[in-house]
């Protein structure tokens, strides 16, 4: 096998001219044919094992809803990847590839170590590892090629975020990277732009080649948002991409993979399905990204991640991004990253974004609806506001949505039992402000990139303090301020101590009744969850009566006559 070489022959100009026209990302077409009866819905088992309808997609109106998504810890999940062949890697025989592109800008080189230290201190930035490059303070200093730089400036960004300032030199240097930063900090662009540079320095894909860049994400929503960023910034280089995730037909994804894509953004389960079926391979992957690594481990994806990485050459560049740095994530980094360099933005202790005003009210369950309405009346006085309401279960999400709509509020709900087409529609209605109230379960607590959410309302308190921080992190993004309102009941008293710690660190007011709970309950909190949390029964109802419209009952409920917005 001949060497790829490292020379300029594969730089962007030759790549572009040889690639002739192919256009940007393929988009994911939904593959639904006329109408699309979901038929009688399958039973669950395994994550995603709940069938999304036993009947085909053809034929008039949607039939019964498919079975539920099932639990992540079922048998199907543990068997995923059993059919993948163990790879034996001989590095001497593998084609060589380029991964080091960073040249330090003169202005960066001239800064004293004291200037660098002050910049890092100002941005609460800590670095670890051998020979960590200095941070950059402007886009020009990052050293991106002009075709990347022009795309960035066209988006109107002022200057790099903290994670980008330090993360870009690290990723462009070809080193393995760990980045720890809060959601909404600009992590996606931190690895996307170096990925584009990396692709344009590699040989073109040959027929049958898999992707060059693989990005693993925990949820469909996050995967779709990453795809949007890659499509936007990779357009000028004609970089092709596809998004591979469950809950939708495989056909369009298979077609994209068979045509050849430089970037594959995937959730672990569906990617393993594709690998086992021989629809793609990972032999060409030289740039691997694990986004929201902590969330993927929380959801029980560790065995699948390990199986996927076993299919990728060991001298690849790996970038791991996470909002937290628990021991499980540290172990994953130790196992799969070589001589990595790390940047942490903010405190390593669990803490909330200080731009968010946190209001915690101790209430009883029967008070919640009235208090929610009172808050919404105040929030929606400003028609530009958007409110994301979190509930503990899918059933309550639907009940609350139906209640709000009947009361005249333009609310819609999103959770794992809803079909992907409906979820996409709800997200778009919320993003565009047509429906400024969205009710969600924790499926939406990470990865939903709606940057102008002004308020988060925790109707039900989550299972642990990490999920609380990630939920409220949906507001106060990209430098904006936000407000988080949380209903806390005596049933949540074991979480009181952790919550008070977070509120105190962020210098927030504390409800005296909450402080009293800490004193009298001795509440120690539930820790940080664990892998077993997502295990569970498959099943799901399936077989509901068909309706002519595309959406579930809660989102189809008519708005009451007393329009509230």
Swiss-Prot record:
Give residue numbers for sequence motif Q motif.
Answer: 137-165
Question: What are the binding positions for ATP in this chain?
Answer: 181-188
Gly residues bias: start-end ranges: 1-10, 19-44, 526-546
Q: What GO cellular-component annotations does this UniProt entry give?
A: cytoplasm; nucleus
Under Enzyme Commission nomenclature, its number is 3.6.4.13
Alphabetically sorted, this entry's keywords are: ATP-binding, Cytoplasm, Helicase, Hydrolase, Nonsense-mediated mRNA decay, Nucleotide-binding, Nucleus, Ribosome biogenesis, RNA-binding, rRNA processing
Subcellular location(s): the record lists: Cytoplasm; Nucleus
The record's section on CDD domains has: DEADc_DDX5_DDX17 (cd17966), SF2_C_DEAD (cd18787)
Outline the extent of the Helicase ATP-binding domain.
Answer: 168-343
List GO molecular-function terms, semicolon-separated: ATP binding; ATP hydrolysis activity; RNA binding; RNA helicase activity
Its GO biological process annotations read: nuclear-transcribed mRNA catabolic process, nonsense-mediated decay; rRNA processing
Q: Its principal location?
A: cytoplasm
Question: Which segment of this protein is annotated as the motif DEAD box?
Answer: 291-294
UniProt keyword Nucleotide-binding present: yes
Highest taxon, organism lineage: Eukaryota
The residue ranges of the Helicase C-terminal domain are: 371-518
- What SUPFAM superfamilies does the record tag this protein with? P-loop containing nucleoside triphosphate hydrolases
Catalysed reaction equations from the record: ATP + H2O = ADP + phosphate + H(+)
Stretches the record annotates as Disordered = 1-44, 526-565
Subunit and partners: Associates with polysomes.
Recorded domain comment:
The Q motif is unique to and characteristic of the DEAD box family of RNA helicases and controls ATP binding and hydrolysis.
Family membership, please give it: Belongs to the DEAD box helicase family. DDX5/DBP2 subfamily.
Purpose of the protein: ATP-dependent RNA helicase involved nonsense-mediated mRNA decay and ribosome biogenesis through rRNA processing.
Q: Could you identify this protein by its name?
A: ATP-dependent RNA helicase dbp2
């Amino acid at each position: 096998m001949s060497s790829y070489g490292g020379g300029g022959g594969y730089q962007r100009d030759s790549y572009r001219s040889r690639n002739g026209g192919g256009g940007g990302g393929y988009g994911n077409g939904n593959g639904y044919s006329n109408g699309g009866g979901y038929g009688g819905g399958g039973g669950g088992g395994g994550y995603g094992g709940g069938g999304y309808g036993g009947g085909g997609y053809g034929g008039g109106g949607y039939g019964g809803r498919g079975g539920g998504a099932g639990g992540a810890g079922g048998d199907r999940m543990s068997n995923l990847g059993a059919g993948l062949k163990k790879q034996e890697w001989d590095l001497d025989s593998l084609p060589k590839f380029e991964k080091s592109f960073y040249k330090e800008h003169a202005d960066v080189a001239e800064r004293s170590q004291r200037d660098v230290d002050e910049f890092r201190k100002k941005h609460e930035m800590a670095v670890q590892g051998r020979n960590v490059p200095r941070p950059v303070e402007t886009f020009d200093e990052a050293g991106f090629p002009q075709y990347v730089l022009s795309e960035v400036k066209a988006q109107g960004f002022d200057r790099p975020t903290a994670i980008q300032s330090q993360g870009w030199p690290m990723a462009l240097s070809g080193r393995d990277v760990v980045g720890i930063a809060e959601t909404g900090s600009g992590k996606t662009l931190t690895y996307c732009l170096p990925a584009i540079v990396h692709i344009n320095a590699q040989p073109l894909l040959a027929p049958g080649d898999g992707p060059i860049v693989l990005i693993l994400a925990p949820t469909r929503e996050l995967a779709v948002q990453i795809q949007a960023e890659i499509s936007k910034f990779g357009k000028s280089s004609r970089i092709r991409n596809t998004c591979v995730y469950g809950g939708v037909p495989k056909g369009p994804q298979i077609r994209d993979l068979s045509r050849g894509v430089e970037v594959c953004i995937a959730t672990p389960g569906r990617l393993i399905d594709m690998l086992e079926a021989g629809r793609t391979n990972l032999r060409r992957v030289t740039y691997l990204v694990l986004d929201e690594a902590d969330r993927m481990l929380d959801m029980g994806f560790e065995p699948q991640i390990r199986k996927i990485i076993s299919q990728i050459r060991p001298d690849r560049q790996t970038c791991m991004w996470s909002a937290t740095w628990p021991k499980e994530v540290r172990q994953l980094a130790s196992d799969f990253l070589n001589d990595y360099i790390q940047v942490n933005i903010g405190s390593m202790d669990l803490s909330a974004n200080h731009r968010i005003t946190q209001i915690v009210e101790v209430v009883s369950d029967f008070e919640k609806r009235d208090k929610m309405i009172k808050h919404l009346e105040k929030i929606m006085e400003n028609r530009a506001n958007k409110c994301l309401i979190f509930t503990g279960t899918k059933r309550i999400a639907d009940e609350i949505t139906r209640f709000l709509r009947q009361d005249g509020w333009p609310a819609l709900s999103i959770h794992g039992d809803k079909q992907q087409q409906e979820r996409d529609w709800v997200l778009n209605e919320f993003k565009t402000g047509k429906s400024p109230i969205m009710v969600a379960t924790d499926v939406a607590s990470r990865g939903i990139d709606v940057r102008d959410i002004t308020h988060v309302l925790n109707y039900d308190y989550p299972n642990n303090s990490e999920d609380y921080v990630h939920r409220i992190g949906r507001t106060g993004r990209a430098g904006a301020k936000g407000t988080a309102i949380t209903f806390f009941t005596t049933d949540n008293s074991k979480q009181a101590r952790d919550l008070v710690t977070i509120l105190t660190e962020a210098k927030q007011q504390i409800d005296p009744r909450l402080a009293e709970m800490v004193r009298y309950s001795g509440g120690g909190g539930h820790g940080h969850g664990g892998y077993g949390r997502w295990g569970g029964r498959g099943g799901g109802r399936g077989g509901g009566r068909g309706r002519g419209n595309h959406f579930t009952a809660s989102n189809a409920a008519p708005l009451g006559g007393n329009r509230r917005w």
